[in-house]
Amino acid sequence: MLTQEDVLNALKTIIYPNFEKDIVSFGFVKNITLHDDQLGLLIEIPSSSEETSAILRENISKAMQEKGVKALNLDIKTPPKPQAPKPTTKNLAKNIKHVVMISSGKGGVGKSTTSVNLSIALANLNQKVGLLDADVYGPNIPRMMGLQSADVIMDPSGKKLIPLKAFGVSVMSMGLLYDEGQSLIWRGPMLMRAIEQMLSDIIWGDLDVLVVDMPPGTGDAQLTLAQAVPLSAGITVTTPQIVSLDDAKRSLDMFKKLHIPIAGIVENMGSFVCEHCKKESEIFGSNSMSELLEAYHTQILAKLPLEPKVRLGGDRGEPIVISHPNSVSAKIFEKMAQDLSAFLERVKKEKLADNKDIQPTQTHACSH
């Protein structure tokens, strides 16, 4: 007749997976019950690995069969599987009420021009506004804001930077931190760290809105910003031509995947009015955006004409909302700022700005 000693001796032949000691020596055998031809075993192991449990179950069952056990009740207890940490909202700029991402699927569509004039138009509404030039590979904001020759200012501790002021807007750009014309040849991690530092190591103070001029595309910079602060709005800048609209769709798709509320689309350079004959020409075509608007449940936030004064203002550091406040484009930026402000109020009321669902998670599990 089978005894507990017989069972223990058989269990001493069961080596714990990936180790050299048996499960009896480890102290994993917690209980043995014998009743007629039935055997009950309670084994407790420190691993939550399903593979480890399966190996032990197979080896123990085989050993007990060889001992003549006909009915085996084998209970292998394991610790709970490690749970991924619950995602939480991350915010490196808690003094800023709203962060707005100005994006484009491609370069050369007027993204920086939009960022500059929108920022000033928001400031003209008596809001505290910051403008962050996150386009580290092509920082045009210093020139467009008339700051290309300005020196950066350190705070008394010498550890943080104070934004420069222009037209009522607090401004910071990588273009202020290295020589004009110097190229940056950075890999993704360096770019990501730079964007985080421009949020945490700049003394922005209490802002109502921070407008962020992004690099073109949908890469590391956009993901880093979205994970670093809850974004209240995403704005895509495009031109009416089909290839630009294709890229605008990618930008809108990025907003959707990163849970960024979409404020709308800015259609830039939609038409040109000749100053001499007053004839209007659609240089880039007049392709409809209705499919984009419907697919992403958004609106055209502004339709800007191709106005020479806009380009001249950017080159001279005199944005059109300042140099020609009564121009067609300036009035459009003014209306755009009002509409964006209303959108941001809705985002705040409905608590739509949250980045907890896009935070990186990492789970560590012991397999032995």
Curated annotation (Swiss-Prot):
Gene Ontology biological process terms, A to Z: iron-sulfur cluster assembly
Positions annotated to bind ATP: G105, K106, G107, G108, V109, G110, K111, S112
Superkingdom of origin organism: Bacteria
PROSITE patterns in the record: MRP (PS01215)
Keywords: ATP-binding, Hydrolase, Iron, Iron-sulfur, Metal-binding, Nucleotide-binding
CDD domains linked: Mrp_NBP35
GO molecular function, one term: ATP binding
Function summary: Binds and transfers iron-sulfur (Fe-S) clusters to target apoproteins. Can hydrolyze ATP.
Entries under HAMAP family matching the protein: Mrp_NBP35
Subunit structure: Homodimer.
Family: In the N-terminal section; belongs to the MIP18 family.
Record-given protein name: Iron-sulfur cluster carrier protein
Organism, scientific name: Helicobacter pylori (strain ATCC 700392 / 26695) (Campylobacter pylori)
